[in-house]
A protein has these predicted regions:
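SAM-dependent methyltransferases
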Residues: 1-72, 82-86, 92-102, 108-111, ...
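K/E-rich alpha-helical interaction surfaces of small helical-bundle regulatory domains
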Residues: 76-77
Length: 257
């Protein structure tokens, strides 16, 4: 442990990660570092220290944990962030650093929803032509290659940063960042005559409005299921529970605000 207090490394720039960083950084007995993947050109500011970029696999992360004298690791990455959760589990085990995963609950279909679960973006692209001709893609700019061969479909693509090829030839891009409102999503579907929605099961409340709008409009939704996560890692559903975990781990820290 360094003289600046217990060092907490938070992986991720999600809403949960930002709220958690703000809560923990308010405690002078803790030193908080947030690590971002660097996939967004202008990420939102985070309290505490921030590092951007990968670690170089589990070995690189383990080395960083040792060199920076990290006392606890919290994985608050996006449910579709790739291999980082597995890297975190291996690195934490290798250097014996306590690890907690913040995993927001997934979305649950309700009466009136017309959802079709698929295992991947490629699966979504395969199922798409049978469901509609004008698709609203909210799966992020990184996965557009899976839909690039669908030349006869039209796509509305919403992402934080501009997408890059390969991507569908008939496409309109909407650069925007949540949270979104049901009223706004309802108008978006109407204005663009969207007849099918494609999304990942991110579970975020900030982007759930599109599902309500789709239900109201009778628009079918292709939902990409979440990838597997490492087994045996303690999990909580949100930042409040993560704060409690840190409080129990380091009971000498002053009460959090």
């Amino acid at each position: 442990m360094s003289g600046a207090g217990r060092h907490i490394l938070i992986l991720g720039g999600t809403t949960e990660a930002r709220r958690l960083a703000a809560e923990l950084a308010a405690d002078p007995a803790l030193r908080v570092t947030s690590s971002l993947a660097g996939r967004v050109a202008e990420p939102r500011l985070l309290p505490g220290q921030v590092r951007i970029g990968g670690f170089g696999g589990p070995e690189g992360l383990a080395r960083w944990l040792r060199e920076q004298q990290v006392d606890a690791l919290i994985d608050a990455t996006h449910p579709f962030a790739g291999t980082i959760s597995f890297n975190a589990a291996q690195a934490a085990a290798d250097v014996h650093v306590p690890l907690l995963a913040v995993r927001r609950p997934g979305w649950v279909a309700t009466e009136g929803d017309h959802w079709h679960d698929v295992a991947s973006l490629e699966g979504a692209a395969e199922a798409l032509p049978a469901l509609g001709e004008r698709a609203f893609l909210t799966t992020g700019r990184m996965g557009l290659a899976a839909f690039a061969h669908l030349e006869h479909m039209w796509f509305l693509v919403r992402s934080v940063d501009a997408p890059e090829p390969p991507m569908p030839p008939r496409m309109e891009t909407l650069l925007d960042r949540g949270p979104f409102t049901v009223e706004g999503e309802r108008e978006l579907l109407r204005r663009h005559a969207v007849d099918v929605l494609v999304t990942k099961d991110s579970g975020a409340a900030a982007t759930a409005a599109k599902l309500v709008a789709a239900r109201e409009a009778g628009v079918p939704v292709l939902v990409v299921r979440r990838p597997p996560v490492p087994q045996g890692v303690p999990e909580v559903a949100g930042p409040a529970e993560a704060v409690e975990w840190v409080r129990r781990l380091f009971p000498r820290s002053r009460p959090f605000p």
